């Protein structure tokens, strides 16, 4: 049985120390970033340079899309399969419980993804069940192999232009973050950055409909099951509803709440490709979206809808996703196979959509 631990606390770092500081301040921030990633796989950043107004508009635009009728969103639907996700995936399409079983060794066949009904006034929960989360994925504007599936401009004017602009801001920030990690890890300049150009990242816009808390208390349902992200790092902005938790690497099964302490703080977590680069020296953060603290104690509570925006920063598609030479030694041989970033993503995406592990030779 998992437990939520109030302590220790995810560290908060001031990004201005790196962006505007002297050599010593930049080094201290870079070292703090590495230390936070090694301990938790998570850090929070303030003064990150993305304005409050930009984040406000981001959430307004996310909500504007999800308020569209399903028939308009369906025009931009992502076709299930192992390819990188592009466009809208409706409730029930993606299932992180398949990743949950893979990563925790708990049989995934015993799990159900979070379900939502339509009549919360009813005391009965025996209604049609569907998966809880819907999301929309945006890829690189220059990606002609896997282009983003956009809604019609006439249905939501100006939306594509804003999202492409925000995507570019996220990519630029993440490249700076790679520079900081190179300093903190004592790697030669451009060791990490060079494998991220051209970009292969994705911007994901998430909406979690409201759900009766009773469905989340059973232990068989969750908004998102424990999982790790696919790429290098994830930048996350979330609303104040709560529920995001990260597993304490030092206490398996114990989860730390990642509550929003400041309205526009940025949450940054380590993802699976970065763990592979580091040969496991820095591990990807296992995290989930669980019942909110308030929902745990009120019998008939309804957990409100939740909004978030995640920038999945990734290596370019043909970059190697195996361990970097600096982290492979006779005492610590390579722990991961040296496939490309695209092959690794297809392997993971196929598992999410079909529950089947894609073989390396099938991923190309």
From Swiss-Prot:
What keywords tag this UniProt record? Iron, Metal-binding, Oxidoreductase
Q: Where is this region: Disordered?
A: 73-92
Annotated EC: 1.14.-.-
Summarize where Fe cation binds, as residue positions: 227, 229, 287
Instruction: Name the source's superkingdom.
Output: Eukaryota
Cofactor(s) the protein needs: Fe(2+)
Leader sequence residues: none
UniProt GO molecular function: metal ion binding; oxidoreductase activity
Q: Name one GO biological process term.
A: small molecule biosynthetic process
What positions does the entry give for 2-oxoglutarate binding? 306
Function (record text)? 2-oxoglutarate-dependent dioxygenase; part of the gene cluster that mediates the biosynthesis of imizoquins A to D, tripeptide-derived alkaloids that serve a protective role against oxidative stress that are essential for normal germination. ImqB is a canonical three-module NRPS that assembles the tripeptide backbone of the imizoquins via condensation of Trp, Tyr, and Leu-derived precursors. N-methylation by imqF and phenol oxidation by imqC, followed by cyclization via the FAD-dependent oxidase imqH carry out the three-step transformation of L-tyrosine into tetrahydroisoquinoline.
Protein family: Belongs to the iron/ascorbate-dependent oxidoreductase family.
List the PANTHER family.
2-OXOGLUTARATE (2OG) AND FE(II)-DEPENDENT OXYGENASE SUPERFAMILY PROTEIN-RELATED
Protein name as it appears in the record = 2-oxoglutarate-dependent dioxygenase imqE
Q: Which organism is it from?
A: Aspergillus flavus (strain ATCC 200026 / FGSC A1120 / IAM 13836 / NRRL 3357 / JCM 12722 / SRRC 167)
Gene encoding this chain? imqE
């Amino acid at each position: 049985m998992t437990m939520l631990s109030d302590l220790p606390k995810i560290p908060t770092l001031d990004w201005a120390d790196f962006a505007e500081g002297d050599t010593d301040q930049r080094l201290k921030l870079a070292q703090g970033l590495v230390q936070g990633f090694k301990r938790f796989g998570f850090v929070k950043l303030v003064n990150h340079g993305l304005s409050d107004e930009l984040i406000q508009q981001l959430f307004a635009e996310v909500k504007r899309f999800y308020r569209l009728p399903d028939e308009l969103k369906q025009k931009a639907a992502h076709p299930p399969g192992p390819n990188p996700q592009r466009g809208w995936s409706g409730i029930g399409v993606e299932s992180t419980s398949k990743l949950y079983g893979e990563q925790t060794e708990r049989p995934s066949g015993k799990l159900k993804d979070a379900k939502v009904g339509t009549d919360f006034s009813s005391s009965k929960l025996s209604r049609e069940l569907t998966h809880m989360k819907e999301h929309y994925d945006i890829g690189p504007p220059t990606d002609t192999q896997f282009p983003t599936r956009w809604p019609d401009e006439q249905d939501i004017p100006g939306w594509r232009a804003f999202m492409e602009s925000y995507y570019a801001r996220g990519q630029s920030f993440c490249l700076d973050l790679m520079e900081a990690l190179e300093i903190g890890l004592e790697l030669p300049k451009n060791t990490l950055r060079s494998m991220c150009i051209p970009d292969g990242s994705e911007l994901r816009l998430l909406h979690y409909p409201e759900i009766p808390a009773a469905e989340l208390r059973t232990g068989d349902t969750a908004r998102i099951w424990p999982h790790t992200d696919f790429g290098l790092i994830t930048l996350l902005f979330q609303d104040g509803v709560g529920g995001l938790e990260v597993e304490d690497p030092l206490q398996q099964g114990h989860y730390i709440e990642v509550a929003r302490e400041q309205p526009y703080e940025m949450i940054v977590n380590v993802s699976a490709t970065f763990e592979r680069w580091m040969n496991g020296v820095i591990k990807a953060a296992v995290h989930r979206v669980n019942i909110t603290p308030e929902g745990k104690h009120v019998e008939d509570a309804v957990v409100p809808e939740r909004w978030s925006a995640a920038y999945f920063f990734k290596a370019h598609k043909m970059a190697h996703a195996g361990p970097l030479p600096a982290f492979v030694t006779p005492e610590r041989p390579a722990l991961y196979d040296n496939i490309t970033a695209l092959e690794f993503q297809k392997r993971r995406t196929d598992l999410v959509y079909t529950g089947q592990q894609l073989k390396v030779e099938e991923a190309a």
